[in-house]
């Protein structure tokens, strides 16, 4: 049984190197590559069972067109001609076409869709359903977005896991944290609770959801009160004196009350950051999914900065990096790019409906189950109905694909060649195609290339190898595409310590401190529980096989929740927002804040799930991110 080396292209930070083999019965076996320094021979359950996704009988592997409300088969040539006809008809009015691309898969060739539609000058989306507020916050603070090398965590004396479920988010980060703890590091977990960090943490602090900025500000105030900031810290910061006055304008009592912790909790966090041993901070994306999510991240950044743990080995701030930062994407900007219209991803339903002069008449969706994954799913569904022609490229009949007019079957990971990089570590990897695609499934790159040739004038995409060679042409790499295929992966040359010597990437070299601390908005009278929809251990976003859906959905609340007194737990239960309600099963936890309700995301509307039906579309303070966790709900019979 031959074994091939390839790489994971799912939307996961670990970007594992994989060993893949197919036995005589056709079963696909996947394991982590022991020769890869980061993957180190193990991978997560999502990957180990991925072969079942490839061979699932409900996978759609032939093009289909909707005719009088019913799906009918269509040949590829006819399907591509149909796409080209609709694009050609609207080409003189390109803003009437909308391209939506998500992060269903990573890789160089996955950028071909953005390249293709940018040449047409169509409408597109901006913002993010993931990490935009936190990403922009870190750039505002540091002048760029860099982390210490992830393995530098092994040099930490203290590790603060702030709003990140390391085991569910990144199994390799969890392993590194576990090893650091064995080496003597002390680990503190801060969150609204119900994460898997208890097995790593020496201490856990449970806070009111969305109030991380007040907690960080309280600890900063304690540093300033005791005058124990890092030596000469003021000379490394822009407007330091103004920041000090600003912090002292807020009382310690008000800050503590806002985040619902004790003075003892503040003292504990202070001890972790005030010691001379380096303290590393791992920031999760959940805490930036609030209206003031960017502000949450900025105050945590400020705490790490003023305590002297930035720019040193064993310290630093760890947040999502850009998955394309180690590759050259000049090819995507080399041709003339026309000016298009931009719609907001987090509010895509309302923005489609509001689009005028011209309205959206054609839509192309790839790499995204947008109706399921973006807020206010029903509104997005209604917006889709206003669009005359909708193309969805996918492998399954998802909540989004089921509303298309033309369905084009895509290849999946292991069936398509690409080059992929990580938003956690610094390895570039060749993702070899190691399994033949079923039926008539085709790559996104092939589809765009074929449609482009049918246009007049044509939109010609260079061949895949040209894109690969260009992507590898960067000062941080010295490897050819041929050599990368031979050795499978290479580590990019980057400093192991970010911002060493407190040298930041703003023009004056100084760190930027937050200047405002917004109060929390009042809690709605009839909806008192803050809805949190974190990741699952078993699947990426909504990439769940239909037979793996479990109903009713499980919602977790605190065993001390004060809002269950009038609920009959023996009867049917519903999670309710002003938009919609879902039937749920209640699970009580003693590790969750009393004002939080946790329902893990990804379930499909068509199977009775779909938590984003409950969540109104809101924008974060910076970055045009989706403020999912600003939604309040209640539980009722």
Segments from the language model and where they lie:
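Acidic/polar loop patches that form or flank catalytic/metal-binding clefts of enzymes
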Residues: 28, 230-231, 266, 280-281, ...
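Generic, well-ordered alpha-helical scaffold segments in large soluble proteins
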Residues: 82, 86, 115-119, 180-183, ...
């Amino acid at each position: 049984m031959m074994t091939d080396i390839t790489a994971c292209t799912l939307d996961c930070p670990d970007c594992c190197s994989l060993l893949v083999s197919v036995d005589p019965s056709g079963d696909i076996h996947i394991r982590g590559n022991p020769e890869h320094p980061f993957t180190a021979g193990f991978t997560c359950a999502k990957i180990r069972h991925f072969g079942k996704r490839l061979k699932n009988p409900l996978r759609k592997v032939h093009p289909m067109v909707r005719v009088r409300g019913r799906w009918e088969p269509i040949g590829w040539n006819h399907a591509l001609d149909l796409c080209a006809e609709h694009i050609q008809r609207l080409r003189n009015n390109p803003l009437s076409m909308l391209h939506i691309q998500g992060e269903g898969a990573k890789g160089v060739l996955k950028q071909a869709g953005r390249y293709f539609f940018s040449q047409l000058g169509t409408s597109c989306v901006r913002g993010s359903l993931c990490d935009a507020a936190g990403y922009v916050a870190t750039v505002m603070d540091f002048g760029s977005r860099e982390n210490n090398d992830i393995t530098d965590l092994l040099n930490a004396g203290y590790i603060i896991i702030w709003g990140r479920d390391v085991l569910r988010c990144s199994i390799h980060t969890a392993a590194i944290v576990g090893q650091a703890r064995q080496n003597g590091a002390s680990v503190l977990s801060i969150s609204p609770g119900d994460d898997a960090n208890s097995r790593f943490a020496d201490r856990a602090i449970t806070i009111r959801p969305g109030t991380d900025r007040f907690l960080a500000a309280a600890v900063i105030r304690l540093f300033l009160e005791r005058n124990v900031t890092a030596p000469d810290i003021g000379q490394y910061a822009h407007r330091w004196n103004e920041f000090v006055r600003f912090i002292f304008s807020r009382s310690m009592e008000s800050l503590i009350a806002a985040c619902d912790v004790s003075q003892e909790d503040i003292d504990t966090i202070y001890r972790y950051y005030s010691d001379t041993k380096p303290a590393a901070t791992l920031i999760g994306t959940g805490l930036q999914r609030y209206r003031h999510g960017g502000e949450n991240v900025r105050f945590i950044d400020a705490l790490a900065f003023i305590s002297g743990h930035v720019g040193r080995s064993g310290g630093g701030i760890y947040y999502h990096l850009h998955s394309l930062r180690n590759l050259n994407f000049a090819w995507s900007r080399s041709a003339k790019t026309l000016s298009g219209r931009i719609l907001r991803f987090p509010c895509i339903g309302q923005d489609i409906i509001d689009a005028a002069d011209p309205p959206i008449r054609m839509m192309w969706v790839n790499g995204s189950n947008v109706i399921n994954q973006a807020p206010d799913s029903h509104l997005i569904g209604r917006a889709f109905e206003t669009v005359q022609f909708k193309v969805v490229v996918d492998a399954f009949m998802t909540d989004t694909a089921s509303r298309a007019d033309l369905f084009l079957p895509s290849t999946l990971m292991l069936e398509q060649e690409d080059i992929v990089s990580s938003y956690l570590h610094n390895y570039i990897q060749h993702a070899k195609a190691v399994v033949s695609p079923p039926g008539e499934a085709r790559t996104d790159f092939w589809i765009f290339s074929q449609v482009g040739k049918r246009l007049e004038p044509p939109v010609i995409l260079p061949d895949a190898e040209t894109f690969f060679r260009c992507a590898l042409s960067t000062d941080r790499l010295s490897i050819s595409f041929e050599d990368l295929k031979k050795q499978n992966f290479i580590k990019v040359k980057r400093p192991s310590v970010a911002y060493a010597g407190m040298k930041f990437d703003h023009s004056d070299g100084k760190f930027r401190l937050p200047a405002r601390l917004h109060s929390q908005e009042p809690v709605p009278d009839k909806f008192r529980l803050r809805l949190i929809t974190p990741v699952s251990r078993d699947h990426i976003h909504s990439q769940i096989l239909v037979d793996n859906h479990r109903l009713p959905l499980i919602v977790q609340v605190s065993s001390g929740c004060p809002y269950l007194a009038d609920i009959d737990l023996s009867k049917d239960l519903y999670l309710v927002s002003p938009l919609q309600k879902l039937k749920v099963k209640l699970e009580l936890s003693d590790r969750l804040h009393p004002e939080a309700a946790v329902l893990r995301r990804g379930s499909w509307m068509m199977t009775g799930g779909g938590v984003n039906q409950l969540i109104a579309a809101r924008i974060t303070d910076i970055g045009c991110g989706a403020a999912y966790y600003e939604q309040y709900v209640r539980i009722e019979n």
